[in-house]
């Protein structure tokens, strides 16, 4: 058993014998069931720094979305010396560390693909280095090049037609959450020692492929840990030993996260479940009288300020998929422990309070791990913050905890992972709506008119027959699932080989569990299309080649989103059927296959490449996002819509089920207290049914329309909304995506 003087006052034994942050938390945290009255406002330092950062953000917006970009230096742990928000204010920064040498400057990260790194530069008027081009073209292979070299013609065709899209073959896969708390609790030297022991115990026998690879990966992890120490030294800190107080705990933890974002540009770079962990240090300092509540809030405000600054250089096709510059610095608060104790601490309040001290913001992606058993005061405070800022998402702790335990993090938008124990292979989405059209048209793509899918016999009847369509759809789904898994196996193999996440994996157990994430797009449209074929009459409209390019519906049919089992059961069937098809395939590195119903803002891109559907959706128009009902389908109010989504079993979609709802303020009540109370009741009822996720927006469409027409108004500079799986500044969306958000249902009644 090891012991450090920095651990004075901390209880427990197991976490001192092995790397076990959960045990440390359970033995030392202080549940809080009071209200928010203890919270402190922003300090003068916070106001000055946030004011300086807002000026930089305004300048960034004026320059078209990018303030500055690196073109000569490849990002690494030690590529840069120290950087600050404002050199003249650097002594005010309680938490330090930038991705590059300047605030909001985007790093050059070519290992995912030199073409992408260069295109990101030229898109915004920057000229990339000719020398780096030669190095990463002639001498060093990148992830992107390796993937495309190995793709089959069928894979390329599926990618081109967007029946599979958004794949992490042109960007870092992300979704790996290092247990950044370990840096604070143990210090880097102890973590190196633990990894060296793993290395010594790996490969004492036959040198198989797996053993050789693991030894190399552990060696890279140890090197990354050493690099983290050098990175911190540039800022004058020695992180070799554990943190001795709250400020060091916040700083050490942030350095761990900074190492990740300096070396990877993953689509999701989550922070993880840190609030209750940090509260232990803050509470110890408060009890000892060496920290005030105002100083504690300042630490959290400054840490969150850093999360709000995370930026990556992206290409236009990426921005179409993931609009508004998200990084998914997802950070969780709340939850209930396995022993039944609430894990709400004062620090959970402090993180939510940053949205009041510094205003709404998309990052970090604040996530409440919700249960109706959470303290009432905390539920009401979270609901109040949601109503005021539309910046918070909620996930059902009661359905996730039996699967992931009580120390999981959200590793992207809505997907859970056991902190420090697991990693996830991110896999984008398959277009199940386009797949239905392939089933009808015999694998011919309705947009390109090319044979993309297998050359099965098309449906040629004038009116679609459910008993004919369904088996053909199942057959085509099975083809798509097989191709999809093969594509992802190839991508994940190449990412491990050419763009391995050693900084993050250094903070995860060596004996790591892996999940293989897949996803579904067009979910509600498939449900309603099959329902229309089954319960109404759907006539196929064909072009001169016989291809079905449109549909006429005669009669009415049950629609998903109205608490009608006839439609909702089709959704349950679709989810289960697709997951079973995925699960029967071989997945890379013995990973466990999961799926999600989640689209991000790629619902617009998917729709743009998908023809008219039998549910009445027009050709090449946006899909409904995530697990949301189709636009205009919801006729029975918010609660009926929520009930439909709640019927989807979480255990068949362990990668997450995203549901985004917009509620007119008057629908919730006519006073702040009434609205807060009603929102809590809505969420209690929704999550008690076993539903997984809810994005809450509280505003009317008039505000969206005004923000779209007058983005220059000061009130809209930080106007934040929740979209499928994340939050975004509304004025940072493209006009097309703004119109998509405006077209969604805004519930005027519960």
List PLM regions with ranges.
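Conserved catalytic cores of very large enzyme subunits
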Residues: 2-750
